Amino acid sequence: MERPGPSDGSDASGPDPQLAVTMGFTGFGKKARTFDLEAMFEQTRRTAVERSRKTLEAREREEEMNREKELRRQNEDLEPTSSGSNVARACSKSSSRDTSSSESDESSDSSDDELIGPPLPLKMVEEPVNPMEEGVLGPLPPPLAEDVEEEDDDDGDSEEEENPVRKIPDSHEITIKHGTKTVSALGLDPSGARLVTGGYDYDVKFWDFAGMDASFKAFRSLQPCECHQIKSLQYSNTGDMILVVSGSSQAKVIDRDGFEVMECIKGDQYIVDMANTKGHTAMLHTGSWHPKIKGEFMTCSNDATVRTWEVENPKKQKSVFKPRTMQGKKVIPTTCTYSRDGSLIAAACQNGSIQIWDRNLTVHPKFHYKQAHDPGTDTSCVTFSYDGTVLASRGGDDTLKLWDIRQFNKPLFSASGLPTMFPMTDCCFSPDDKLIVTGTSVQRGCGSGKLVFFERRTFQRVYEIDITDASVVRCLWHPKLNQIMVGTGNGLAKVYYDPNKSQRGAKLCVVKTQRKAKQAETLTQDYIITPHALPMFREPRQRSTRKQLEKDRLDPLKSHKPEPPVAGPGRGGRVGTHGGTLSSYIVKNIALDKTDDSNPREAILRHAKAAEDNPYWVSPAYSKTQPKTMFAQVESDDEETKNEPEWKKRKI
């Protein structure tokens, strides 16, 4: 940068005498400075190069520190020791001092350059200038003590990132009472505004976090599947529909307010090939929405099929997947799920196998592991990680296993000693994919159910939460809210959260006070206390109970005395005795009993003498041919038997 000398400036830019006379002063003070654009551009280029070099050095130092931490983690336990952290901190401080010294040297070299801008005040020029401050653009760095504090904060943040247990939001909890029976289904919409619960009591209840207060009451309760247990509830990826899977053979889809949108059709159970039916023919187990395609979902059933459906076409399924054993026989799928991108369909079967299909190829599975869990047990849950490469399975053999679908020939890890007694016990991944969560079951009065956390990288049991004195059936870790929902075997649903780590959800309703119940306005009859009131307004004095009962006994209305029979003609809607009117007398006489109890032989012989004296019918016909009446002779049975032939006689 060029500065004009005093001699040059006096000739070129001296005061104009005419202007001085007009304005009343002799000069304008200091002279304007000139700037060299090329020098300014060169200075800017140097600054950019220096900053990029510092950024690259910082990245290299960070990579070296990460490599050192990985080596220490492999050689030592899970948590880094204090000595290792001190060494790393000392190394980082020494490297920072080296870089600061090199930066000071370079800045001192560049301090010889000329200044840019107007001249500094006199006080600042007289003060000693730190060579570190000349080449710095922007605000000055903080003191050394603050640097040390920031380094400590960074170390704390890195330790928190390394230790995923600190990210578990379990400092606070709320309890939602669904009912008295097992909470077998949980669902939370993608935004985290509404929670839906279902249980063995056939009820589905809706909970709105923004609308609830500290009483935690559901705003709607219904029974969408009548007398069938609710097995699965899941919101669609848009949050406007809920898939309801119950113990029946027909799944239902309802909207956010509980109104039915569609119901799957039931298939023909008399057809052998289940692919030729239009729907399921046996009890359902679970269901799942497609993560990408709106309106598509999947169900599995006891008819040994996994079917995909569309909301727009409830009269027939979209496709059918038929799990098979290695011998080609039918096998019942107990749970199913989509991968995170929706390209794969995974199902766990009763023979202990896990089968994975390509969604567009329904014939043969893409992956098939036949002994994933013990045969004859119900695998209750399979779920994919958020990165889509790892599959977790919760078996009925009290195990939790982790699988890599890129090498689906053996499990990566396996954890045992996790009892389960429900066919819908859940397992899920944390939002950062570093933890796996599942629940345990207990007998009544034999302990408390737990929520167990495993680290995905080492599969070590790193944390446990005692939920309640009942089994833990369902668990759900919402990625947006960072809150954990748990369904238990005693009808409770619990929500775990941390005010500092969680968002919205349970935090919205905890701060609201419970509304006071409105007192019902009851109208009571006022007593007339004045003793000299009119008789029609006067009320009787309160008597003793015994006297009041005796008086009520004499009252036919209060004692419910039966009505006496009506004498004479009927009245008051009651029929009187017979014969009171002409019509009743006629009816009574018509309906008389006229049965003849006389002897018929005597009645005939009564007319025998008259018939003999005055024959009219039979006797005149025989008067000439047979004037004397002849009767047949009575023969004994012995004579009849004698006249019979020998072959007709009875043998004794």
UniProtKB/Swiss-Prot annotation:
Any one of the GO CC terms: nucleus
Signal peptide as annotated in the record: none
Classification via InterPro entries: WD40/YVTN_repeat-like_dom_sf, WD40_repeat_dom_sf, WD40_rpt, WD_repeat_GAD-1
SMART domains: WD40 (SM00320)
Domain of life: Eukaryota
Numbered residues of crosslink Glycyl lysine isopeptide (Lys-Gly) (interchain with G-Cter in SUMO2): K294, K588, K594
Basic and acidic residues bias: start-end ranges: 45-76, 538-563, 642-652
Modified residues (Phosphoserine): S619, S636
Acidic residues composition bias: residue spans: 103-115, 146-162
Biased composition annotated in UniProt, kind: Low complexity: 92-102
Name of this protein: WD repeat-containing protein 70
Keyword Cytoplasm assigned: no
Coiled coil ranges: none
Region (Disordered): 1-22, 45-171, 538-577, 629-652
Post-translational modification Phosphothreonine, affected residues: T577
Repeat positions for WD: 178-217, 225-266, 279-319, 328-367, 374-413, 419-464, 467-506
Modified residues (N6-acetyllysine): K450
Family under the similarity heading: Belongs to the WD repeat GAD-1 family.
Gene3D superfamilies per UniProt: YVTN repeat-like/Quinoprotein amine dehydrogenase
UniProtKB keywords: Acetylation, Isopeptide bond, Phosphoprotein, Repeat, Ubl conjugation, WD repeat
